[in-house]
Each structure stands twice: as structure tokens, then as C-alpha cells.
């Protein structure tokens, strides 16, 4: 399965996509928690392709209960196992600190499309379940081709 296929699969399952919505709301606590999870320096870094695969596993494993879920990351970190765990954590921390990884929280509810195509890349859009929005999203990254997807969130 390609990275594009993985992304589109997640888009069709929004419950798995909005898990990390309020990342920067609890930014310093998250970084501290992640840093405590790192046991040792990785022997090597992950390729961009492998980084994306591991990030998707991580994001899918997070609970979708708002910012508090970021303060309890242990279960989600278990999704990244084996030799890549240490490297993934180091790269995740580095990307967060440098703002290379951007997780956006949208605060607009409505039926009009939100055009996010002018945002800097790479980025992931992860929304909380209480939002209802139709979003057109352009994702660009070195490991991903341009992908335009539309998806809807409706709060039950």
C-alpha cells in the first residue's frame, strides 16, 4: 500500500484522523512527555517513507478525546514498535520542536469548504470529533505526491 493509499484510507476513517488536533495547545507538556519516552539515541534515522508509515500508526493509535489525550501517550507510542521506535521518537520530537510537523486545529464549523492549500507543507490536518466541516485539503511532502481529498466530519 502506497503512502497515498494510506492517507486516503485514513481520510475515509476520520475517527482515526482527528486524534492529535490540539497538539500545540499542550505543546510543552507533549514534548516533555515524549522526551521522557526516549530511552537512548537511535542508531540511525528513519527514511521519510518509513517516518510517514510510523507517524500514521502513531496517529491512528491516539485516542480522540481532545488535548488531554496528548498527556497520556504511552498507548499510542506502543504502536511504534521494534528498532524504529527510538528513531521515530527522536524524529517526532525534532519535527515538533522545529515546527516541521504542523498539526492544525480548525475552529470553523459550517458547510463551506475550507481551503488549506496555501498552508506550508508538510502538514497533517487532524480534527476533533466535535467539529463539522467539509474540507478540501492539499497535502504535499517529499515522500508524498500532491493529493487533493475532500472529506466530511459530522458530530453525532
UniProtKB/Swiss-Prot annotation:
InterPro entries associated with the record: HI1480
Domain of life: Bacteria
Stated name of the protein: Uncharacterized protein HI_1480
Amino acid at each position: 500500500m502506497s503512502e497515498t493509499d494510506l492517507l486516503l484510507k485514513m481520510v475515509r476513517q476520520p475517527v482515526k484522523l482527528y486524534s492529535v488536533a490540539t497538539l500545540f495547545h499542550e505543546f510543552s507538556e507533549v514534548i516533555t512527555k515524549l522526551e521522557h519516552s526516549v530511552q537512548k539515541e537511535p542508531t540511525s534515522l528513519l527514511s521519510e517513507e518509513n517516518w510517514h508509515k510510523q507517524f500514521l500508526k502513531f496517529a491512528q493509535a491516539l485516542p480522540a478525546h481532545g488535548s488531554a489525550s496528548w498527556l497520556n501517550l504511552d498507548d499510542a507510542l506502543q504502536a511504534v514498535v521494534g528498532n524504529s521506535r527510538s528513531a521515530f521518537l527522536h524524529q517526532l520530537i525534532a519535527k515538533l520542536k522545529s515546527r516541521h510537523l504542523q498539526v492544525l486545529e480548525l475552529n470553523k464549523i459550517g458547510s463551506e469548504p475550507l481551503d488549506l492549500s496555501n498552508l506550508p507543507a508538510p502538514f497533517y490536518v487532524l480534527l476533533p470529533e466535535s467539529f463539522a466541516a467539509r474540507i478540501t485539503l492539499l497535502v504535499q511532502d517529499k515522500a508524498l505526491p500532491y493529493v487533493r481529498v475532500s472529506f466530511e466530519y459530522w458530530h453525532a
